[in-house]
A protein has these predicted regions:
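Bacterial N-terminal signal peptides that target proteins for export
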Residues: 2-12
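Extended hydrophobic/Leu-rich segments
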Residues: 5, 20-23
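Bacterial N-terminal signal peptides
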Residues: 11-19
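Extracellular/periplasmic carbohydrate-active domains that bind, remodel
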Residues: 23-467
């Protein structure tokens, strides 16, 4: 054998040894599968190859070293950890590259928004997978994702054909972890989990232009130590859509130690924290609006809301809302309302359903809020003949801006309307307005005004109170 052949043989053996070593210790570097990370070359095919290699070996950690990885759809599989090292960015490809997977076929899209219907046309997606995780101190930048919802108009890609509409989309998965990552510009939803069981979202930072985190028809999920800035939509929202073609409860959910805000897009991440000044600022923690099954056994604790709307709990699609516990919430510069609880009969679902939306056993304790909008105080409204039952408000102090005028026009019944107080106009009371409630308990509830308000502090209509 010549020296040249010996050198070639040695190099080949060395390369094979390195590759096998990577596989044997369960770590799969995407650079070894062709990823470039220059922000110009499409890298999702190489990343998917690394994932498939790990799957063939029974699973493992797929690592993205520092670099910018221009990507279309990445398909997450069972027993895979997608790990973004510091300095690694997954950059969503623009529509013109047509890099996203085709949307799946779905037979009943009329009962929920398109964002809840289609998953495969996302930047990172998984369906019917288990033991999956996305970790690391890297970033997902959804620059090429759309924030539009146009699927119901016949465009199944969510925007221009070929455009992804979600940063992370998980459906019918089990044992899910998303930890430490940052998401900037997450598309229609930065994270959506639908029909998933046993999940953890921890220490995640999101600065996006639509919903931050959507937990839909899921059970046994925890969202903790997470910061979400969403000036134009909901920050952390639980839903119960018809995306699984049947009513499914969202239940056994804990949201704790989180911060939600409504600053201008990008200013949370860059640290300038510029308040959004448009009329509609959201950034709230919400249950709804999709509520076919409803919500049960939900705890929200130790959270902060800043420059955003407050808490909204809505069941209007024939589901039920019960056993909701809220404790230790701090709010500052609150848009529209601090707390909103309502039932209604929008009934967005199959017409043959006969259930009536219901809510009961809602306990809200230890809430402090300052600089709240004068539009509305706390709102608790059921439906005539179908009251909300057993609502407890205790240890609550809210400071309102005041300046409201007397309200002579009857406040509208929720009925079939979309549940949004700003469309209903000012409430009859600046502090608390309740209607159709059976069992309202108030303990140590205090309202303050920054300037005089012509409305009374509390107005109750068709309400039975409990001492």
């Amino acid at each position: 054998m010549t020296n040249k052949m010996k050198r070639f043989t040695f190099c080949a053996i060395f390369a094979l040894t390195v590759l096998l070593a990577g596989a044997s210790n369960g770590v799969y570097n995407v650079r070894d599968y062709g990823a470039v990370g220059d922000g110009k070359t499409l890298d999702h095919t190489a990343i998917n190859k690394a994932i498939e290699a790990a799957v063939a070996d029974g699973g493992g950690r797929v690592v993205l070293p520092a670099g910018t990885y221009l990507c279309g759809s990445i398909r997450l599989k069972s027993n895979i950890e997608l790990h973004l090292t510091p300095g690694a960015t997954i950059l969503a490809a623009p529509a013109k590259l047509k890099a996203y997977d085709e949307s799946e076929v779905f037979g009943a899209p009329e009962y929920q928004d398109g964002g809840h219907t289609y998953f495969h046309n996302s930047l990172i997606w998984a369906e019917k997978q288990s033991n999956i995780s996305i970790t690391g101190h890297g970033r997902i930048d959804g620059e090429g994702l759309t924030k539009r919802d146009t699927e119901r108009a016949g465009n199944l890609q969510g925007g221009s054909i070929g455009t992804g509409d979600k940063a992370i989309a998980l459906k019918l998965c089990r044992n899910v972890t998303i930890r430490d990552i940052t998401i900037y510009r997450g598309g229609h939803f930065a994270i959506i989990a639908t029909g998933c069981e046993i999940g953890t979202i921890d220490n995640v930072t999101i600065d996006t232009n639509r919903d931050g985190i959507d937990i839909d028809c899921c059970k046994y999920f925890t969202v903790s130590n997470t910061k979400v800035n969403t000036p134009n939509d909901d920050a952390i929202v639980l839903k119960s859509s018809y995306a699984l073609k049947k009513p499914v409860l969202c239940e056994h959910i804990l949201i704790t130690n989180c911060i939600v805000t409504g600053y201008k897009l990008g200013t949370f991440l860059d640290g300038s924290y510029v308040p959004e000044k448009v009329n509609w600022v959201c950034g709230r923690i919400k249950l709804g609006t999709e509520s076919n099954g409803g919500y049960r056994n939900i705890t929200i604790a130790n959270c902060t809301c800043m420059w955003s709307s407050g808490l909204a709990f809505e069941v209007v699609d024939q589901g039920r809302m019960e056993n909701i516990v809220v404790d230790n919430i701090s709010m500052s510069h609150v848009h529209h309302y601090p707390i909103y609880i309502t039932t209604g009969c929008r009934n967005r679902g199959p017409k043959e359903r006969t259930e009536v939306s219901s809510a009961r056993d809602i306990y809200i304790n230890n809430v402090i809020a300052d600089d709240c909008d004068s539009l509305a105080g706390i709102i608790v409204t059921g439906m005539e003949g179908h009251p909300i039952r057993n609502v407890s408000l205790s240890n609550i102090r809210i400071q309102y801006r005041g300046g409201g005028r007397s309200v002579t026009k009857p406040y509208r019944e929720q009925g079939t309307n979309y549940p949004e107080p700003r469309w209903a106009g000012p409430t009859p009371a600046y502090g608390l307005f309740a209607r159709h409630v059976d069992g309202l308990r108030l303990h140590n509830v205090d309202f303050e005004l920054m300037r005089p308000d012509e409305r009374p502090d509390i107005v109750l209509e068709d309400v039975r109170t409990i001492d």
